[in-house]
Swiss-Prot record:
This is Ribosome-recycling factor. Keywords: Cytoplasm, Protein biosynthesis. It is found in: Cytoplasm. GO terms for biological process: translational termination. It comes from Bacillus thuringiensis (strain Al Hakam). GO terms for molecular function: ribosomal large subunit binding. Pfam families: RRF. Its main location: cytoplasm. Responsible for the release of ribosomes from messenger RNA at the termination of protein biosynthesis. May increase the efficiency of translation by recycling ribosomes from one round of translation to another. CDD domains: RRF.
Length: 185
């Protein structure tokens, strides 16, 4: 029973770190990346639809994103959705494709982005710690029910703590790499 709690906690911690990595992909670091548009929803025939489902997105240059809609009539809607998403980007529409030039980041903007990265890192750590707390609670219930001994409880609790430390270190490493990427000029 205790092994199942450990396995479940481990999987949940892995998911928390994966979600953090996906969240960081939307933080732009001066280079063009299609992932900045991941959360942009276009009102397409009355239904909110992700840009990636409506267009081919390419990165021909380090600071340029080209969006080529599959349906040319949706180009205006895509442009409006990008502006409405308030990503600090200015799309230019030439009738067939939308080009987004990424301006060079100022020192102040870089520092702001690092703060955002740190905030996301803290949220990910809290998520990992919540999984630890839930796992420990489940183990205590098993011990109360007599399914595991007090020694087993202590051992499993230590194992969950080791996993927690491992995943928090992973979050710190990911954050450090992203901060380094952002601060590169």
């Amino acid at each position: 029973m205790g092994q199942q709690v450990l396995k479940s906690s481990n999987e949940k911690m892995e998911k928390a770190v994966a979600a953090y990595s996906r969240e960081l992909a939307t933080v732009r670091a001066g280079r063009a990346s299609a992932s900045v548009l991941d959360k942009v929803q276009v009102d397409y025939y009355g239904a909110p639809t992700p840009v990636v489902q409506l267009a081919n997105i390419t990165v021909p240059e380090a600071r340029l994103l080209v969006i080529q809609p599959y349906d040319k009539t949706s180009i205006g809607d895509i442009e409006k959705a990008i502006l409405k998403a308030d990503l600090g980007l200015n799309p230019s529409n030439d009738g067939t494709v939308i080009r987004i030039a990424f301006p060079a980041l100022t020192e102040e903007r870089r520092r702001d982005l690092v703060k955002v990265v740190k905030k996301y890192a803290e949220e990910a750590k809290v998520a990992v710690r919540n999984v630890r707390r839930d796992g420990n609670d489940d183990l205590k219930k098993l011990e109360k029910a007599g399914e595991i001994t007090e020694d087993d409880l202590r051992g499993y609790t230590e194992d969950i703590q080791k996993e927690t430390d491992k995943y928090i270190a992973k979050v710190d490493e990911i954050a450090k790499n992203k901060e380094k990427e952002i601060m590169e000029v």
